[in-house]
Swiss-Prot record:
Protein name: Magnesium-chelatase subunit ChlI
Pfam families found in the cross-reference section: AAA_lid_2, Mg_chelatase
A GO CC term attached to the entry: chloroplast
Keywords linked to the UniProt accession: ATP-binding, Chlorophyll biosynthesis, Chloroplast, Ligase, Nucleotide-binding, Photosynthesis, Plastid
Pathway the protein takes part in: Porphyrin-containing compound metabolism; chlorophyll biosynthesis
Function: Involved in chlorophyll biosynthesis; introduces a magnesium ion into protoporphyrin IX to yield Mg-protoporphyrin IX.
InterPro entries cross-referenced by the UniProt entry: AAA+_ATPase, CHLI-like, ChlI/MoxR_AAA_lid, Mg_chelatase_ATPase-isu, Mg_chelatse_chII-like_cat_dom, P-loop_NTPase
Lineage summary: Eukaryota, Cryptophyceae, Pyrenomonadales, Geminigeraceae, Guillardia
Binding site for ATP: G45, D46, R47, G48, T49, G50, K51, S52
Annotated family: Belongs to the Mg-chelatase subunits D/I family.
Swiss-Prot/TrEMBL catalytic activity: protoporphyrin IX + Mg(2+) + ATP + H2O = Mg-protoporphyrin IX + ADP + phosphate + 3 H(+)
Amino acid sequence: MTINITKTKERPVFPFTAIVGQEEMKLALTLNVIDPKIGGVIIMGDRGTGKSTTIRAITDILPEIPIVENDPFNSHPQDFDLMSDEVRSRIEKGESIPSVMKKVSMIDLPLGATEDRVCGTIDIEKALTEGVKAFEPGLLAKANRGILYVDEVNLLDDHLVDILLDSAASGWNTVEREGISIRHPARFVLVGSGNPEEGELRPQLLDRFGMHSEIRTVRDPELRVKIVEQRSEFDKNPSACLETYKNQQTEFKQRIIQAQKVLPTVELDYDLRIRISKICGELDVDGLRGDIVTNRAAKAHAAFNGKQTVTVDDIKAVITMCLRHRLRKDPLETIDSGSKVQKVFEDIFADLM
């Protein structure tokens, strides 16, 4: 008996530009895609508000990237900071490196994942008997130059969250076993989502996420009806729905590509940087991550809107998401919705508004 296996097409993804009512979450994801050094985003909100749908939708819209063919780490064919040691040594020997274009990958990290599954494993027996570094790549290798998504991140083991955040911040994953060490690039946008009713992350871990997006269930009945209709249309005929939003998707993709190009040249005036740091000081934010992330996010926002210089509007659009999860609070309090940050912002920027 012969079984014919046909290659199935990729499952259609709900178009990013069709998602309505969750603008803060969409903006946070977009800015992290433009500048991954912002440090990722944690999205907390009610069940059934489209968190997972939106995250998968942003991945589908991203431009393709060049990678070294058959490389498990998605190494860049030219950029030494984004390639594995093996590819680098091949280039230094003068070998020809074939490359292909590939869609940006989105890797799901399951809650039950072990450290070996996340980081990868070294075959100690092979290393000792044959003298070669036999490495089985983990999820961090697959996520290099892509998006790593952790649903219900607040339920993930703290030790694993630490590993993810360390790799996201340094851009490298190092695996050490029995005196053998292997490292590979792990530059990814870390996106976590969860329901605050199921528990919050520790403040030390929360602070490591660049941005915090808070989403609530849409209450406006007309908007709710619109969302339900859109979803029903997509489920009934995905290809027709995708065709409807094709031009908007293409335009959005071009805006991201252009923003990534101009980002290095975007300027943020010294006076505005001083005011951002004043806000962080007034809010009693620990450390300097708040200042750094706000500066980066404001520049990314300016680039996304085609500007060469950051304005007050750019800072206003991002500062709440950059700081709300860094405020000191009592253990029984929930994370501030943003009213404290906005009040201090308005006080310090009053003369420029």
